[in-house]
């Protein structure tokens, strides 16, 4: 399984603001994915969990870790150029079974058009 490297992550406030202000939001049961089309740029992803939306620091970190791991396992199926994506966790991301959270992320990425389907033999 591939790691999402430093080049694959949103790091600057400017990047997060650009995605938030100009991106399109796709809502799921456990998270929102905001996708900004950035032709020519490598695909990068960021994870956000607000204090008001999720809870204290331990809960926010756990929600981000859970989302990050699910996206990491699907990273090969995400186009490697052209998108900036921001995942915003809901409180339910803390308690949802892993499979429910994973299927929610897949559904939202699929509706955003940023997740390739699995090969027939997989």
Predicted regions and their residues:
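Positively charged, solvent-exposed patches that mediate nucleic-acid binding
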Residues: 1-122
